[in-house]
Amino acid sequence: MAQHTVYFPDAFLTQMREAMPSTLSFDDFLAACQRPLRRSIRVNTLKISVADFLQLTAPYGWTLTPIPWCEEGFWIERDNEDALPLGSTAEHLSGLFYIQEASSMLPVAALFADGNAPQRVMDVAAAPGSKTTQISARMNNEGAILANEFSASRVKVLHANISRCGISNVALTHFDGRVFGAAVPEMFDAILLDAPCSGEGVVRKDPDALKNWSPESNQEIAATQRELIDSAFHALRPGGTLVYSTCTLNQEENEAVCLWLKETYPDAVEFLPLGDLFPGANKALTEEGFLHVFPQIYDCEGFFVARLRKTQAIPALPAPKYKVGNFPFSPVKDREAGQIRQAAAGVGLNWDENLRLWQRDKELWLFPVGIEALIGKVRFSRLGIKLAETHNKGYRWQHEAVIALATPDNVNAFELTPQEAEEWYRGRDVYPQAAPVADDVLVTFQHQPIGLAKRIGSRLKNSYPRELVRDGKLFTGNA
């Protein structure tokens, strides 16, 4: 694999020499940092099993190497990456996999280790969505996830990835993560804090990642991280699990943050060792039981993961001073909900008791039941999935609901050819050789729902959202 030149500040190299265990080679560290990062993907098991995915993609000649800490994760090698980017493959467009760095699959593996089965989870710094979607898959779209993102521009990307993967159990918020300890104390069974950090571990992906690096900056970031982990710990219920992770390598932003929390709440913090998380995990194990992953150990990004349990309640923080405002939705009455459910089933949309119908004006939404306890405590950017808009003739079903709720075995499902599916993703109407009989058509490709179409004569009218429409070369190779 080709080398690339990474910028290393001298002070950073000195710091790494001191931080690296004697069992590891500093020369190996430098060599690993100069190698470009291996590509990796995670199969979205909400849509397809790993076995079926491997069978589906077998004809492509992809080399898929299992990632030891994630059963559905694979390093991927492809011959035609330049000809067809991974993000333009049919399987990616329909949400069958997520392009995710292997190291970043570690925190969720830690969160669900030892049979942990949380019902209400918070992802404090969620964008672009790799870990939120991984959490949802581990929960099988049940329970509820609060996915927060401080950056307004990244909330939109977060929602797009959640929608593409067919996820229905997520509520999105846009807050500084330091508010949650006061706003929602002891409300969560598990919390992932993948903290903002100095990014020292990402040089294999970005050779200039350390251009603005300084020891002083690390100290400032660590101060913010301490405030974030303190807030997250307050939001965690007694007995709950908190996973703290970063993509950086210095101890000040990693071990020291966790040790600070332990010193602050000595009777309430229990470190849960990660040495048995996967075969070979002990190679990165610290004396506290954390995983400090230098890039040469597993040939991946540098990363840090700690898991801890809250063993008892801690003193509450002062109540927040902000006002949430009125919640603009109201629950749909049982009789009407039954009528809506019946109409939705007619076009192949079905849901279970984990989701409940709510209404705002002419909009119908499905919210995860597990998030209802947070209504009135935080302001949501987006909650659950938009099911439909009502109009005089019935319902206008929404694309995100089709992707999350439809099953391809519906009587109105219509399988497209590769060329027709590509036209669909380009936002164009489709003219199949033999048009379906039904007026409302569940459009599928590779037996996966990709949208809902209206049949007008021999034409299938495209309803693919404009913001998702793709240009350029797609999976058939035609531009």
UniProtKB/Swiss-Prot annotation:
GO MF annotation terms: RNA binding; rRNA (cytosine-C5-)-methyltransferase activity
UniProt-recorded name of the protein: Ribosomal RNA small subunit methyltransferase F
InterPro entries, alphabetized: Methyltr_RsmF_N, MeTrfase_RsmB-F_NOP2_cat, MeTrfase_RsmB-F_NOP2_dom, Nol1_Nop2_Fmu_2, Nop2p, RCMT, rRNA_ssu_MeTfrase_F, RsmB/NOL1/NOP2-like_CS
Keywords: Cytoplasm, Methyltransferase, RNA-binding, rRNA processing, S-adenosyl-L-methionine, Transferase
Family affiliation: Belongs to the class I-like SAM-binding methyltransferase superfamily. RsmB/NOP family.
Keyword Glycosyltransferase set for record: no
Catalytic center residues: C247 (nucleophile)
Organism: Shigella sonnei (strain Ss046)
